[in-house]
Swiss-Prot record:
<keyword id="KW-0997">Cell inner membrane</keyword>
<feature type="transmembrane region" description="Helical">
    <location>
        <begin position="39"/>
        <end position="59"/>
    </location>
</feature>
<keyword id="KW-0472">Membrane</keyword>
<keyword id="KW-0813">Transport</keyword>
<dbReference type="InterPro" id="IPR010968">
    <property type="entry name" value="RnfE"/>
</dbReference>
<feature type="transmembrane region" description="Helical">
    <location>
        <begin position="182"/>
        <end position="202"/>
    </location>
</feature>
<keyword id="KW-1003">Cell membrane</keyword>
<keyword id="KW-1133">Transmembrane helix</keyword>
<keyword id="KW-0249">Electron transport</keyword>
<feature type="transmembrane region" description="Helical">
    <location>
        <begin position="128"/>
        <end position="148"/>
    </location>
</feature>
<dbReference type="InterPro" id="IPR003667">
    <property type="entry name" value="NqrDE/RnfAE"/>
</dbReference>
<comment type="function">
    <text>Part of a membrane-bound complex that couples electron transfer with translocation of ions across the membrane.</text>
</comment>
<protein>
    <recommendedName>
        <fullName>Ion-translocating oxidoreductase complex subunit E</fullName>
        <ecNumber>7.-.-.-</ecNumber>
    </recommendedName>
</protein>
<feature type="transmembrane region" description="Helical">
    <location>
        <begin position="69"/>
        <end position="89"/>
    </location>
</feature>
<feature type="transmembrane region" description="Helical">
    <location>
        <begin position="93"/>
        <end position="113"/>
    </location>
</feature>
<comment type="subunit">
    <text>The complex is composed of six subunits: RnfA, RnfB, RnfC, RnfD, RnfE and RnfG.</text>
</comment>
<keyword id="KW-0812">Transmembrane</keyword>
Amino acid sequence: MSQYQEIAKQGLWHNNPGLVQLLGLCPLLAVTATVTNALGLGFATLLVLVGSNMLVSLVRDYVPKEIRIPVFVMIIAALVTSVQLLINAYAYGLYLSLGIFLPLIVTNCVIIGRAEAFASRNNLAHSAFDGLMMGIGFTCVLVVLGAGRELLGQGTLFEGADLLLGDWAKALVMQVWQVDTPFLLALLPPGAFIGMGLLIAGKNVIDARLKARQPKTQAEPVARVRITKVS
């Protein structure tokens, strides 16, 4: 198995930032009331992850170890500011919807964790790919959780997609079933905690079943060595 395949498996499943590392839970639980918000935050996090991993990998040999964390945070903050200005300019409605959680990407442990644990120790290509896979894995968790909460709470999917993609995206909105009164438990933070717990439980069940299907290797018996004298 190549290193790229291993990085992809780690980011998407085995070491998923949301389901395994349980990092970035604050924005993950707060803004996933709709698929649109989940996609917007996931896209922003993905851009920052890839950019920060690349820049940290480039400067890793020039930054003293004693000040590496402040330097990494400054790099991440610069990228987050750039992404924030980009969303403010081209998706203002989404910018208002995400609110404070957009600049708080700076403190997201997923990003600083990958910068410290991976990008600071690997080359540019591997670091960029790691950021991409971790970002996609985190975004997938956001989207699945957002879809479940929106579907249960409002009976819709892609509500407000025009905030992210423009007026043409209004055609993407799907009314799966008619909801007279929104199911507030799904839309509020308690529903996010319950949904996240179900996702983690589902992953654990899948992992357990996959492990059970693997052929069990039987250890070879070890021959005993006689240590007593024979008279």
